[in-house]
Amino acid sequence: MLLYVHIPFCESKCPYCAFGSVVGKRNLTSAYFDAMIADFREQILKFDVSQSAQNRQRSGKTEVSKQNSGEFDYTSEQTAKPNLTTKNAQISQNLNRKNIKNAAVNQKKAGLNLANSNLNTKECGKIETVFIGGGTPSAVDAGYYERLFEAVAPYLAANAEITTEANPNSASQKWLSQMKSCGVNRVSFGAQSFFEDKLKFLGRIHDARQIYEAVASAKTAGLENINVDLIHGTKLDTKKRLEQEAQNVRNLGVSHVSAYSLTLEENTPFAGKISYAKDSPRLAKFMIDRIEEAGLKQYEISNFGQICKHNLGYWQGKNYLAIGAYAVGFWRDHRFYNASNLNAYVKNPHAKKIENLSADELNLEHIFLGTRSIVGIWQNSLNTEQEQRARLLKKSGKLKFKNGRYYAKNFLTADEISLFIAG
């Protein structure tokens, strides 16, 4: 079981960003964390997340009785289907935030109450990983996270991976040290670039110097598992500049890099106004090669280095809880959508929508996620026609087969391969 925590507060809104975030509304911070804690406590009851004996003793009154918990108010999305058409086959970094985009759906109120529903939610074990994303988690005082982790800590597995995102300009050494005290052992910085003109183009409010300072502060705080996000495929990118980006990563000495191709999302300032680099696909391959030369091995289309257990869990199809506005959770064959509005979530954190996933839809997601990563596609998950198409791709050299799984030889061709296999 994984846990995703969404912090929507931002210092500014980047023109390429389609993730749920708000600028301002800091007066709601305390109420927002109260809502997330209430949401978490309700979900651990329903999904029967277990505590260790030691944690159960230590937590005392942390366990919440059903009589004192809030009430889930779920609606059902009966006709939702993943938006995996050829035009929209590029599943961007949303996958790293547990969210395959869905086409417009007809929503029908079903009056479901999760606490009393017939979903099969037997004990799912402990929480193996936590990912605090945003938004900008470092824009919120660490004291709020202390409250949150008082509720979460009793349910964590030993050696759980706990990641927080942070921006270089707001992640002070004090904040990073306090987050480490909460249990955080991995930090992901939204660097995006080391070039000042590119940072300005992307609407970032930090400079290159602050990236180096933030990474140094994280190391001083005792955080050694460090990721930096980079964006490539902008009109400013050239091979020479991307080579320098990779060299700067090497100089930082971080354990992980996420290198995303610029995605022009709908309903963002960039949509319809900004164009990609003319040779974006070739630049993407060039960037991959340079990052690997820096000593960080690719294990997913956009990820390199020490494997992020949380993201790996998404690609493996593990169950995950999700708390916070805009967050999306998953349990077996259901996806749960929290309110996509900050005020609405604070008012009722238990109101959610359910998307019921068919076996075919789950199979499709497994194919798309598997080809983009080291997870691969299980041979026994494919039907006869899909298996025949996979064999053709293996024969043509686009797939390799090992220990019962098919793997893409080039992650950049993953969507093309997936569409062909899925039929």
For the regions a language model picked out, list residue spans one by one.
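A short, conserved structural fragment
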Residues: 395-404
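Short, low-complexity, charge-dense intrinsically disordered segments
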Residues: 51-60, 69, 87-96, 100, ...
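Aromatic (phenylalanine/tyrosine) cluster motif
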Residues: 47, 72-74
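Local cysteine-cluster metal-coordination motifs and their immediate loop/turn environment
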Residues: 8-19
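Short, amphipathic alpha-helical interaction segments positioned at domain boundaries
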Residues: 411-423
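C-terminal scaffold of the Radical SAM
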Residues: 1, 22-47, 98, 123-383
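Short amphipathic alpha-helical interaction segments
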Residues: 383-395
